[in-house]
């Protein structure tokens, strides 16, 4: 009987711990990039566009996108906070896609792009929710590291550059998109880094996510 009571107490304890851990996942930042390999990442159409140098992902080459395909949330995020350290070089364009899916070729059609661009000819600057809520101001310089932060909670997207909020967008309930952009909406999905073109060279490191309750 004593052993049975001990077993019951332990069972309740472990289930409680498991439940607490699930509820508290939003309290922990989880790294998506180990700094050494492309484990859990999958590149599209031109994989050679992405390289690893000194613990950084370097995007430089023909159009390609690097999708997170790892075990965290089974690479299917709905509500979350994401942050990454980013550095652009002069004339470079890139982006971070959210709520997207792996796509073999072309610009990802699902989800939203958060712009990385401090000096390239496209007027939509770093922090823009591309084509939806665009930023004209330049908040950071080329050749300097900055933090790009993205939060999705419900129908709201918050984007910060070095702790400064540059976008606070709420998706309308009666959302309508053109036929060529029907999947540009909040749902759930993974993240992707963009390799825009051979003239663009952008660095990423310290890519962290904090899942939030659905």
Residue positions per predicted region:
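Carbohydrate-interacting regions of secretory-pathway proteins
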Residues: 17-214
């Amino acid at each position: 009987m004593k052993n049975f009571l001990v077993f019951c107490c332990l069972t309740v304890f472990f289930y409680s711990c498991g439940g607490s851990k699930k509820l508290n996942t939003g309290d922990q930042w989880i790294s998506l990039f180990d700094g050494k390999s492309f484990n859990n990442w999958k590149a599209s159409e031109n994989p050679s566009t992405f390289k690893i140098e000194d613990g950084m992902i370097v995007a430089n080459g023909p159009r390609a996108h690097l999708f997170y395909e790892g075990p965290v949330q089974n690479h299917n995020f709905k509500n979350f906070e994401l942050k990454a350290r980013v550095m652009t070089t002069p004339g470079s364009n890139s982006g971070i896609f959210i709520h997207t899916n792996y796509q073999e070729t072309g610009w990802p059609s699902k989800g939203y792009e958060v712009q990385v661009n401090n000096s390239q000819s496209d007027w939509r600057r770093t922090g823009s929710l591309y084509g939806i809520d665009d930023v004209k101001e330049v908040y950071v310089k080329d050749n300097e590291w900055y933090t790009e932060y993205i939060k999705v909670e419900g129908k709201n997207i918050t984007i910060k550059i070095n702790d400064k909020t540059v976008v606070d967008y709420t998706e309308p309930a009666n959302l309508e998109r053109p036929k060529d952009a029907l999947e540009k909406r909040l749902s759930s999905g993974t993240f992707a880094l963009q390799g825009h073109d051979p003239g663009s060279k952008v660095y990423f490191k310290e890519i962290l996510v904090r899942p939030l309750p659905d």
